[in-house]
Amino acid sequence: CLAIAHVSLQVGDRELAALVLCLAGATAGFLVWNYPYGMIFAGDGGAYLWGVVTSVASILLVQRHPEVSAWFPFLILIYPVWETLFSIYRKMARGVSPGTADALHFHQLIYRRIVRGVFHEDHTHQMRIRNSRTSPYLWVFALLSIVPAVLFWRDTPVLVGFCLLFMVSYVGAYIAIVRFKVPKWLRL
């Protein structure tokens, strides 16, 4: 949201910036109240609301301001988009329906292969706190696409390059975690 607000202000669209800043404020309030103890469950409804508002704001930004590359919002949203596409591919490659639930999503692997190894059961005895320790890893990973998107919001070839780099990095990190070859610096 902040990335879209920043670019909206860069192109002079104060109304759109205000809309996404409201969503960012609501998200920050939810985060302050909810992290790390999980006091409120946003669930699918919350995720859909955030996704729809972010997507509509992205479409409006690109539609109203042709100087903003259409790849800007794509790079901002590449993590959930690529996670979904990769999960569909992964399941189809195994001959499983893409609609079948599994525990092989990136965040679940980070939890099972990294977080549980770093924060032992005796240090975090509450399930909600253990689960919340996955979030900082995902925030850093998401920033790998958000920062370049904000820096190069007009430059389509650079944004496409960062999209490809993100996809390759995601697959590389996924394979490394699955094979238990997680770099030591990620375990800190």
Protein language model features and the residues they cover:
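Alpha-helical transmembrane segments
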Residues: C1-L188
